[in-house]
Amino acid sequence: MSKRDYYEVLGVARTATDDELKKAYRRCAMKFHPDRNPGDAAAEASFKECKEAYEVLSDGNKRRMYDSHGHAAFEHGMGGGGPGGPDMNDIFGDIFGNIFGGGGGGPRQARRGADIGYVMELDLEEAVRGVERRIEIPTLAECGDCDGSGSEDGKVETCNVCHGRGQVRIQRGIFAMQQACHNCGGRGQIIAKPCKTCHGNGRVEEDKVLSVKVPAGVDTGDRIRLQGEGEAGPAGTPPGDLYVEVRVREHAIFQRDGDDLHCEVPIRISQAALGDTVRVATLGGEAEIRIPAETQTGKLFRLRGKGVRSVRSRSEGDLYCRVVVETPVNLTPEQRKLLEQFEATFVGEEARKHSPKSATFMDGVKGFWDRMTS
């Protein structure tokens, strides 16, 4: 089932401010929280959906990627939480922080940078032969001024509230919960002199230009993984990956079916009746098809090995050419007269002999009406 639009999930406009997003998330989370809806699977699903939407839209970089590429930008992982999406421990920590005034943002510590999704559109020829493309993606890169530490002088201190854990335990009635430490923001460390460039984050926004080699034979839906080309990890953790999803544009001649190609070949009535040799286009140039006499529309001709070389097995698909007998148009008086003379020869048994399908069809129509009127 396709995902709902994140703005629709939170009930806000695409121009919503950060404050409007936060208020909408709070309302959504309070309404669907599992503790308020015990045993309600639909409410739990809505709660997760709300959490996922807010994680993306509350992050400026992720929001820009979502506005540009939609859900495809995050199919291999969201935020710093890894490719599996948010788990219930993180969700409970975040929501209770919001409900009880502890602030947003879960207590988790990211183990790596976020993965990035990018959609690359290719022509069929590029997908079949392979291509190298330069792309530009918005991302978070390690701050060069502080080498990713977030500290102007490189010094950090262990938080004296959470003692480096990044989380604190709170008791609310019968509930014991963990949430991000308010003193260090969940990092477990205090930066006395934040870097002036990244403001203590250790990462800065930048547009990265990359060269992507697309192998021959890719098709719509195939993904190319560029390891380590995702967002820089916080506090020196490894970067995420970049996933390039391929989308192949429709072609004017060929339709692709896996490694096979299909096309239509129009021929004249005279060619269909008398037979002929016609030239057809293939990905490797032209080829010839011998049309036997009395060929009908719909007949398939198979050209082995003229399809697409598989990106996985390296075997080659086939090209299937479907003949379409074209009715002549814009006839000259002489051509019309010749056709009228030709049609006049189709009388009695001669018509049945030369057009068996037409005769069989008319017999069927006559039999149908006889049965209907008897």
UniProtKB/Swiss-Prot annotation:
Cellular component (GO) terms are:
cytoplasm
**Quaternary structure annotation from Swiss-Prot or TrEMBL:** Homodimer.
User: Membrane among the record's keywords?
Assistant: no
* Entry keyword Chaperone: yes
Q: Which organism is it from?
A: Stenotrophomonas maltophilia (strain K279a)
| Major localization class | cytoplasm
**Superkingdom assignment:** Bacteria
CXXCXGXG motif repeats located where? 143-150, 159-166, 181-188, 195-202
> Can you tell me which residues the record assigns to a coiled coil?
none
Example of a GO biological process term: response to heat
Give the matching InterPro entries.
DnaJ, DnaJ_C, DnaJ_domain, HSP40/DnaJ_pept-bd, HSP_DnaJ_Cys-rich_dom, HSP_DnaJ_Cys-rich_dom_sf, J_dom_sf
The protein's location, in the record's own words, is: Cytoplasm
Q: Which family does it belong to?
A: Belongs to the DnaJ family.
- Which keywords annotate this record? Chaperone, Cytoplasm, DNA replication, Metal-binding, Repeat, Stress response, Zinc, Zinc-finger
- HAMAP family found in the cross-reference section: DnaJ
* Protein name according to UniProt: Chaperone protein DnaJ
